[in-house]
Amino acid sequence: MSTAPAVTYDENSVPPISTVAGTGIAGFKGDGEAAATAQLNRPYGIVVDSTGTLYFSDFQNHRIRKITTDGKISTVAGTGVAGFGGDGGPAVSAQLNWPRELALDSEGALYVADGNNHRVRKITADGKISTVAGAGVAGFSGDGGPATAARLNVPMGVAVDSTGTLYVTEYHNNRVRKITTDGKISTVAGNGAAAFGGDGGPAVSAQLNRPHAVVVDGAGVLYIADGENHRIRKVAADGKISTVAGTGVAGFGGDGGPATSAQLHLPVGLVLDSAGNLYISEFRNHRIRKMTTDGKIGSVAGTGAAAFGGDGGPAAPAQLNHPFGLAVDCVDTLYIADYNNNRMRKIASARLAGLPESGAVVSWASVRSRLRMGVWRESTRDGAEVHQLLAAPRDHQRWRLVAAGQHNGDVLYRIENVRSGKVLEIAGAQQASGAVVAQRAYEGADAHHQQWRLIPVGPVAGASGVYEIANRHSGLLLRVDTNARTVIMQDGAEGDHRSRQWQLLPV
């Protein structure tokens, strides 16, 4: 069960930092158990899928692991033995060799920069692994031909755009290459020389110096962590390259001003949030910086000291130790691979101020009746009705709140029953008042009748943590009009306001 606090922080506080995985001891341990008690060994790349599951490369364990929304950790790829093998079979039985960054496509396939195998591997949603780029021999060759016959040289970063095109940075080739959906490979940035040059001209003629992460925005613009150039480079849709952050002088400085006038020190990780802000992890500055859409830069986490500290408080004075990969979820929670601390950290989203943290397990009490929301007869079947019931310390009355996205600036949740794993929905996706509430397996991001907005209403009759629960599809509120045990329905805002108010109680 999640140990997430019921409410992240209040509206007057700064988003806090916390640890989501790892004890700080380097090793391999904990699969099937709580991620917070697991051992990691140099976590590197990270990505979060649409359901809130977090995947990361456990670099020195030669594995890819995942953390589900209930806080449990497991291995999805790699045996722990460095090597190459297993293509065509289950990813958990395959060998990886110092895996780096990760990316996800729209079909849920996971791409792995399998660095010392000089390959990019793909893990499909059914858990099978294959090679999509690289012949396994370090070098540079193959442009214009099949990506699987090409030579790569320590692929580091991977990104997938909206069309399914895959981008790969190569550390020793000082290039960014792309693999189109027909499997062909080509170079999009870098001429192979480890240097700096070419801004304002074609990216393929420019020079990069040990590139790390790459990300791509919705318009097809690439951002590259140009590591030893201590810069962030941008490749526009027309193929022209420019610098968007960093002077090229290694160091720390420039917060509050233009990112192009700031000093960076070995930028390695990148991620874009939903507003287009770019987050940068700096390996040697032990910091996370943020470049806003107006080109200004600032620090969001880390003091510059290589250490561990600050959990539970604001991220800015917290300590990181050689941070690497970055990721954001659907509500812009920021995840950090805190490499030398052997931990996965997260910074709560500003959008969650005054709202429950994603992953929190709670019970819901009707303000009117004080009865608890629960699945009728503890059923685990699809379509089972949700009632208000006498309070009982059992899982059919416990609900996991998982962020499901944003709509018109509001955070949406799926409300998942702990016993059944099914989510709260309006039966039949009805929009009429009086429609009953039931549980059903989650149907994905387009299932608006299974997504909910929590509307804080403040303390009520001495009770804190009180919300109205509004369905995204219908816009109506969960409501009970009696103190008897009965089915919960959706309705409008008329009548006794207590009948549509629910108190969140931490479990």
Q: Where are the model-predicted features located?
A:
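Short loop/turn segments immediately following the C-termini of beta-strands
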Residues: 59, 115, 171, 227, ...
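A short loop-to-beta-strand structural motif that recurs across blades of beta-propeller domains
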Residues: 62-66, 118-121, 174-178, 184, ...
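Extracellular glycan-recognition/adhesion modules and their associated mucin-like linkers
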Residues: 354-381, 398-431, 447-484, 501-507
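Gly/Pro-rich loop segments of beta-rich domains
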Residues: 9-42, 72-98, 128-154, 184-210, ...
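Residue-level detector of Asp-centered blade-edge/turn motifs that repeat once per structural unit
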Residues: 48-51, 104-107, 160-163, 216-219, ...
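Conserved beta-propeller blade signature
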Residues: 53-55, 110-111, 165-167, 222-223, ...
